[in-house]
Amino acid sequence: MVGQAGHYRWQGEDLILHCQLQPKASGDDIVGVHGDRLKIRITAPPVDGKANEYLIKWLSKQFRVPKGNIKILQGELGRHKTLGIHAPRHLPEEAHICFPK
């Protein structure tokens, strides 16, 4: 996939990622693109911000960035989220994201 898709865009060095989160799943993984969002499953429950904290920690490993480089831009209380990931060093294949040219 070349260029930008509906589930992400680049703003300089920042990756803006539109996600659909499935908390309290049986495992952690990137399911794939569903419509204009990237579906992500995590085991953390959606209680007291635990799912958001876990999501940031887990994504920091996937994109190989410090946790502080990932921000929830929209959707802090919902399953549909927009994330900002500053200067990702790795793009997981299952996320279907390309580095900008």
Curated annotation (Swiss-Prot):
It comes from Cellvibrio japonicus (strain Ueda107) (Pseudomonas fluorescens subsp. cellulosa). GO terms for cellular component: cytoplasm. Coiled coil: none annotated. It holds the Pfam family DUF167. InterPro entries: DUF167, YggU-like_sf. Belongs to the UPF0235 family. This is UPF0235 protein CJA_0091. SMART domains: DUF167 (SM01152).
